[in-house]
Curated annotation (Swiss-Prot):
GO cellular component, as recorded: nucleus; ribonucleoprotein complex
The keyword Cytoplasm appears for this protein: no
Biased composition (Basic residues): 346-355
Protein name as catalogued: Nuclear speckle splicing regulatory protein 1 homolog
Compositional bias (Polar residues): 44-54, 329-339
Length: 355
């Protein structure tokens, strides 16, 4: 156990002795160099060089303003003080919100009251005569009357203008709405007419250039700004002309027309081969999905009732005949029994008389 180096209890590690070479004072040939070179740290490894370089880069990227709390606080408060100063100036020049309107309306009422009094006074003077108008009239009063007369004329002009400017309610609303719809409709009609014109011009150009291929025509039209394409029948059409007013029915090709002619001829020849009655019934219009008149409805109702009545009569006749047959068969057996009984009695009587 002593040879292994372990002991019972705590295994206390021995402290390493300090390097004596580092503490020794040596004198070399570089003692005459400057003090900065003597105290400069000498990197011992590559990792220490990297850490030194990273510390230098951090020092270069260091922003001294990140700790400027006082400057930031002062700038923030200065902005707040400026805002408060602006509000104070605005509040100094601020007036009551509705006071100006109230003052203006009060002046207007006062002017209207003055005009009403002047009108009443003029009417009174007219009733009294011309002499009464010249009594106790001064130059200032004449000037005042001129101002009042001018105010009355201005008021009349304002009333007339307000009457002409004011709308008549729903009438003007509907009139403006109809005018707007009419303008939209007119613009749509003009657009359709323009598209038809362009389509006709394209058709004329296509007829005049039959020798060129469809691809060349489409390329030329695209250069001109038109939008063309080939439809299912290999016809060149304008995209604006595809959906025009009315039903958008495509033109049937020549093959379809020939096929329809063949079907029509075959149908006509088949009808000619039929009898007149069959042809009449086939040519009658099919009214299963159509409309009927009252006379036709009444006629059909009567025919249905007659068919029902005849069917009931036939059923009653059949049931009656079956009952008669059963009854007749029963009567026949009774007569046969009666005749047999009579013959039996006769034979018995004969036997009694001839022992």
């Amino acid at each position: 156990m002593s040879g292994t180096g372990f002991r019972y209890g705590l295994n206390v590690m021995k402290k390493k002795k300090p390097n004596e070479s580092s503490n020794r004072i040596t004198f070399t040939e570089d003692d005459s160099s400057s003090s900065e070179q003597e105290h400069a740290p000498i990197p011992n490894s590559f990792s220490s060089q990297i850490t030194a370089a990273s510390d230098a880069s951090k020092d270069d990227n260091y922003d001294a303003s990140i700790y400027g709390f006082d400057e930031f606080y002062d700038s923030m408060k200065s902005a707040e003080r400026e805002q408060m100063e602006l509000k104070r100036l605005e509040s100094k020049d601020r007036r009551p919100k509705y006071m100006e309107n109230l003052i203006e309306s009060a002046k207007k009422r006062k002017r209207d009251l003055l005009l009403a009094r002047e009108r009443a006074l003029l009417k009174k003077n007219e009733l009294e005569g011309d002499d009464a108008t010249e009594k106790f009239v001064t130059s200032s009063y004449k000037k005042h009357r001129e101002e009042v007369q001018k105010a009355i004329e201005d008021r009349k002009e304002e009333d007339e203008k307000s009457i002409t400017d004011t709308t008549t309610g729903m009438k003007d609303f509907y009139a403006s709405m109809l005018d707007r719809q009419e303008k939209i409709h007119q613009a749509a009609v003009e657009g359709v007419q323009n598209s038809k014109k362009t389509g006709a011009e394209i058709g004329d150009a296509m007829k005049g250039q039959d020798t060129l291929g469809s691809d060349n025509l489409i390329l030329e039209a695209k250069k001109k700004g038109l939008k063309l394409e080939l439809n299912d029948n290999n016809e060149i059409v304008d995209q604006r002309q595809i959906l025009t007013a009315g039903l958008n029915i495509r033109k049937s090709s020549a093959n379809n027309s020939m096929r329809d002619d063949k079907k029509r001829n075959h149908k006509s020849s088949y009808k000619r081969s039929l009898s007149p009655s069959t042809r009449y019934h086939q040519d009658r219009p099919d009214k299963r999905h159509g409309t009927y008149s009252l006379e036709e409805i009444d006629k059909q109702r009567k025919e249905f009732e007659n068919r029902q009545r005849l069917q009931k009569e036939k059923e009653f006749q059949k049931s009656r005949e079956a009952a008669l047959k059963i009854h007749a068969s029963r009567n026949t057996t009774e007569t046969q029994v009666q005749s047999a009984r009579e013959r039996y009695l006769q034979r018995k009587k004969k036997a009694a008389t001839n022992p």
